[in-house]
Regions:
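Acidic, Mg2+-coordinating active-site environments of NTP-dependent enzymes
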Residues: 1-106, 129, 183-195
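Active-site flanking residues adjacent to catalytic metal/cofactor-binding acidic residues
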Residues: 1-2, 108, 138, 167
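Short, conserved glycine- and acidic-residue-centered signature motifs
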Residues: 60, 113, 149
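Active-site beta-alpha connecting loops in nucleotide-dependent enzymes
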Residues: 91, 122-190
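Switch II (G3) loop of P-loop NTPases
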Residues: 106-112
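Binuclear metal-ion centers of metallo-dependent hydrolases, dominated by the metallo-beta-lactamase
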Residues: 198
Length: 198
């Protein structure tokens, strides 16, 4: 269980099973350190071994550490685990990035929940330099959870230099109403950063 996540600690309170923890910050059975976090990937230190992976962000570091811990507990050798982990790549639509000839980086991610969007934008902000802008294009699908729309709008506006709200398959819903629900979550100070396209 992720020891850095308070929800993980809550889950451990009521189990009688043998407990193993992993963390980047807290004391845990399995620890890792992020040495480099770039758009091209992560350089991690796990059990005093360095590992380069083509995955990006803290959330992937936690996922990789969970994989490492599980494989170790199943009896795989450390170097075999690290070698296999180094071959992992992101799936299509998850933090895919392309750099244009003008050195503009575009990132595509299927972040369809507020937490996923927050993780992606925080990861980008942790990697980008101070003079780079983060322009986010985000939409919410129709006939789906309407409660998340204002949350996603607020997160996108807060964590971006500029944000463009657009449609993402409105299905049977009115696209203008979906955009209004997304915009409803934007704070007054962040509203000047937004553009909506129906």
């Amino acid at each position: 269980v992720n020891e850095d996540d308070r929800n993980g600690r809550v889950m451990l309170q009521n189990t009688k099973a043998k407990k193993y923890t992993y963390a980047l910050k807290s004391y845990a059975d399995y620890k890792a350190q992020i040495l480099e976090n770039q758009f091209a990937g992560l350089l991690l230190k796990i059990d005093n071994q360095e590992l380069w992976v083509k995955l990006i962000g803290n959330f992937n570091a936690y996922n990789l550490l969970a994989i490492y811990a599980t494989a170790d507990l199943l009896g795989l050798e450390q170097l075999e685990i690290l070698q296999l982990m180094s071959t992992l790549e992101s799936v299509d639509g998850r933090f895919q990035y392309v750099v244009s000839e003008k050195n503009i980086t575009a990132i595509v991610d299927y972040a369809h929940t507020p937490d996923a969007l927050k993780n992606v934008l925080e990861t980008i902000n942790s990697i980008r330099t101070g003079n780079e802008e983060l322009i986010t294009v985000v939409g919410c699908g129709g006939d789906r959870d309407t409660q998340k729309r204002p949350k996603m709008g607020g997160i996108a506006a807060k964590l971006s230099t500029k944000v463009i709200f657009t449609n993402d398959n409105p299905r049977t819903e009115n696209p203008t109403e979906i955009l209004a629900q997304i915009e409803a979550g934007v704070s007054p100070e962040d509203y000047k950063k937004t553009v909506s396209i129906a």
